[in-house]
Amino acid sequence: MKLTCVLIAAVLLLAVCQLDSADATGYMRKNPSLRSPKRTRGCKSKGSFCWNGIECCGGNCFFACIY
């Protein structure tokens, strides 16, 4: 029973992550200025806390900006 609950929770978490990344991709497609690699104004630097890769200058986020 516990294993089933853990598996269901993991699948739901993965589904939410996929929906979140799909929304971010669509937003970047609509706003071309966000796709520019030279865009650094207003972004967070390496080691800063983040929720989404869009917030980071390098575009990679795992609770903190990676690059």
Swiss-Prot record:
Domain of life: Eukaryota
Compartment annotation: Secreted
Propiece span(s): 25-37
Membrane-spanning intervals of the chain: none
Tissue: Expressed by the venom duct.
One annotated Gene Ontology cellular component of this protein: extracellular region
InterPro entries in the record: Conotoxin
UniProt keywords, alphabetically: Disulfide bond, Knottin, Neurotoxin, Secreted, Signal, Toxin
Chief site of localization: secreted
GO MF annotation terms: ion channel inhibitor activity; toxin activity
Domain notes: The presence of a 'disulfide through disulfide knot' structurally defines this protein as a knottin.
Family: Belongs to the conotoxin O1 superfamily.
Protein name from the UniProt record: Conotoxin Cl6.6a
The organism of origin for this protein: Californiconus californicus
